[in-house]
Amino acid sequence: MEAYGIAGHNYVKLRDIGKAVGFNVFWDADSGCVQIETDAPYTGEAPSAEAVPSAAAPSDVDAAKQDIVARTNALRAERGIAALAADDQLMRAAQVRADEMAATGTYSHTRPDGRKYYTVTDCRQVGENIHQIPLLYLAQQKTALAETLVYSWSKSAGHMENMTDESYAAIGVGLARGTDANGMECWYCVQLFLRSGYSISAVDKPATK
């Protein structure tokens, strides 16, 4: 490893250390500084955009939805609260909410056409959690969507209250790919909850602006 003498001190290039030790060092033009990736082998190049996962297969999305339901029920079990049943109509409604947000970029409990979120069903006894997660964040953190979602919701008092509300008996989950306000690819994620003793007989189509 070549050292350089400057003003009586010896210096070694950071990229040479990266090569020798086995971590990546690269110049990040966006931030205007050198970046270090301790968990990646040396290439001298910034990570490519291919690090962001491609569109998930339907089976993967279905598995993520089931995982979200399971993780939510695990939180309830820890508190001695009855599990939520995955309701087909509520699952459809949650997917409509995720789809309409992804299609319009409207990240809100208000639907793209200005109506309240619960108008996606014919029952007002419905609660909603929403989240927007960039794909790049999941790739950088190396965490699964379901794990990240439920953990994030559990750290928010209002979202956690919905997930552990004893008056809710059923759950629906919707996931859709879209872009956020900055143009970054992201997941639009929805949980819908239905109070005990109520049912849904109709689900609306996705709303537009």
Feature map (PLM): residue ranges:
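Primary recognition of N-terminal secretory signal peptides and signal-anchoring hydrophobic helices
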Residues: 1-56
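Second-shell loop/turn segments in exported
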Residues: 2-7, 52-63, 77-87, 129-143, ...
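Extracytoplasmic/secreted proteins, especially bacterial periplasmic and envelope-associated proteins
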Residues: 12-16, 63, 67-74, 85, ...
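Sec-exported extracytoplasmic/periplasmic mature domains
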Residues: 19-23, 73-81, 95-106, 135, ...
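N-terminal low-complexity, Pro/Thr/Ser-rich intrinsically disordered segments
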Residues: 44-73, 208
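Short, well-ordered surface patches within globular domains
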Residues: 60-119, 166-172, 176-178
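A well-ordered secondary-structure block
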Residues: 116-198
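Short, low-complexity, Pro/Ser/Thr/Gly-rich segments in the mature regions of secreted, periplasmic
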Residues: 194-209
